[in-house]
Amino acid sequence: MKYSAVLVAALAAIADATIPIPKGGVPGQPIQESGKGAVFSGGTNNQLDLQNPSNIGGQPATDNGLVPNMKWSFSLSKTRMLYGGWIREQVIQDLPTSHDIAGAQVHLIKGGIRQMHWHRVAEWAYIYAGSFLISAVTEDGQFQLDKLGVGDMYYFPKGAAHSLQGLEDENEILLIFDDGDFDRVGTTFMVADWISHTPKDVLAKNFGVPPSTFDKTYNPDLALINSTISTKTVEGGNGALTGNSSYTFHISNAPEIQVPGGGGTIQVVDSKNFPVSKTIACAVVRLKPGGMRELHWHPTAEEWLYFHSGNARATVYIGGGLARTFDFTAGDAGVFPDNSGHYIENTSETEELIYLELYKADRVADVSLSQWLALTPSDIAAAAINVPIEVIEQIKKEKQYIVS
């Protein structure tokens, strides 16, 4: 008997109350454990239904009201395919709730180059596959030339001139921009695009070369190109960017923090240890199976999330009795509104969850619900949430970050 026939038979039996409804509802169907709901009888995407149980039968009873979508899968993004690799984005047109941040995945083959360019916004990056040669120049003629590997990051301030080159067979990077409307005209400026739209006699005068030098300039402009790995170094100008001025950050400078609550680790990279990163702050979070980022909120900005591996569930409380639960998997992005309350839980029994928290801010900051209750007079806190004082008195006063 085919799976669909078995499912139909099982659902019919459930409808007749001949067998109990599974805990958490019927997988892939809008049927809750309580008996609420019914089967899908029309068109539906079964794979998406199975990946998002919190939208159907698995939604908690505590969810309430109309809460906008806060999730986007990069698999739904249009992929721009080029000879040097590919690019796919999440911008505000994809996820209208993401005002502060836009994201992109960029893949470069060995020798592939992300063309020389600059932006009207800042660009931050996290490398999760391969390695890259990073090149940048400031308005003062200082330069950066650095090789970055998995876990390393960079930050280019608004207007900084830069380029990337892939150094291994396959290289992939997450780019973050501090404006959700990243595709707006006047955001990205490509050097080859500019040159191809400048009269050749002007170019000749500017660079002191014959006009024919620019006969083969790329037109239309290519964001990625094939090339060979650079063997050149850079000298002169006003010297290299180093120390607190460096645009690059090696993750070895941010050891994993074994948090008090157990259940995982956090690595924080913000302006405290990466001084140039003034508008993007990051936490790399690893949750063990069953681990949970404790109930908290962020006082400084929206939280933009990138899920690198594993599976997660999060409930977002946006005030006024409104709350919604979302399911996340590898390749998903999410955004939680400024100051909204939430948690993130690893729903796997065997696999570690790895995700990035990103903020349009100079530092990572959160307020722990548990710590707030514990550091409030216990009788007041107990009255506020209608629990015995003993419950408040046993809550740890130290921020736990992650619990298991």
Swiss-Prot record:
Name of this protein: Probable oxalate decarboxylase ARB_04859
Described purpose of this protein according to its UniProt entry: Converts oxalate to formate and CO(2) in an O(2)-dependent reaction. Can also catalyze minor side reactions: oxalate oxidation to produce H(2)O(2), and oxalate-dependent, H(2)O(2)-independent dye oxidations.
GO biological process: oxalate metabolic process
The protein's required cofactors: Mn(2+)
Localization per Swiss-Prot or TrEMBL: Secreted
Family matches, as Gene3D superfamilies: Jelly Rolls (2.60.120.10)
Cofactor: how bound: Binds 2 manganese ions per subunit.
Chief place where the protein resides: secreted
Glycosylation sites: N226, N244, N346
Secreted as UniProt keyword: yes
GO CC terms, sorted: extracellular region
Keywords: Decarboxylase, Glycoprotein, Lyase, Manganese, Metal-binding, Secreted, Signal
Any one GO molecular function term: metal ion binding
Signal peptide span: 1-17
NCBIfam families attached to this UniProt entry: bicupin_oxalic
Lineage summary: Eukaryota, Fungi, Dikarya, Ascomycota, Pezizomycotina
